[in-house]
């Protein structure tokens, strides 16, 4: 009664695989932990919506003509609704400081020019010392409102220090085009000419930026708060600031590279830890299997064996009632080695030893040769 198929070795069950490391679950949160936006992100966590709502911006070109001088070409952005047409604007340029000093209404068809230099920046810091992030350069805003009151067809802003003046409250000022000029040497030349009261005229047209190295970003921050001096209309806060995109681009690339390397290192460490844990568990399991096999071999070596001794009469044709090996179903022959189990059943030694290495039980009565008990299987 040999088995149809030998089952696998009865060894201790393998330990369950180690659970996934918590670091693997935290890897998707690594960019958030390190700062997904990288350098230049908003301090309050709010996300800017560039060119949103009524604070849209488009690139403009300003051609300035001065007497007995070469024409100046300036670049900037126009603040206004994206749906509004961009008609050709032109007229005489007048500096608001001079207009305020003369206390006279300029002629029709003129363009107001307001600027913020070092003196205005120092005054702005002095006036807004200790104030919150919603403090605005009030003098500049008052100049802009006075220009609209006097009938200026457009507002031209010369902000020489973009790092100082970032936020302008221009509530109710979008009835006229507001143009912020990029800083360049031509802006300085224009400002010097206007301070000398040189008569200058300008034409403002929409167009693409002429310089690839200068970028301006108009950002609409809805979290900056409402205007303190608004007239009850649209009172969101337009934050004007040079984005310096080309300057921040290498820094952003460096930040992305550092973030990528950090994620790769963390992933490599997690994978290495998982492999070490897997190898350790395999070594432990292999050691347990080897120990179990050595125990079975020692037990088999301690079992009794004997040589089969048959009478001369039995050495001829086998008797139908003669004993057989329950493993190979063959008769016991003279001088064969037999294995005698503790349950007194005998088998061919070469047949039953491989069975005992796999099952450790008697093929007939299921007696466990290791534990000296009968198996319930």
Swiss-Prot record:
Zinc-finger ranges (RING-type):
325-366
Q: Which SMART domains match?
A: RING
The GO annotation for biological process reads: ubiquitin-dependent protein catabolic process
- Report if keyword Transmembrane is assigned: yes
Q: What's the domain of life for this entry? A: Eukaryota
- Which InterPro entries does the protein's record reference? Znf_RING, Znf_RING/FYVE/PHD, ZNRF3_Arkadia_E3_ligases
Membrane-side (Extracellular) residue stretches? 44-250
Positions of glycan attachment: 186
Pfam families (alphabetical): zf-RING_2 (PF13639)
Q: Name one GO cellular component term.
A: membrane
Q: Which residues cross the membrane?
A: 23-43, 251-271
Would the keyword Zinc-finger be found if you checked this record's keyword annotation?
yes
Question: What is the protein name given in its UniProt record?
Answer: RING finger protein 215
| Organism expressing this protein natively | Homo sapiens (Human)
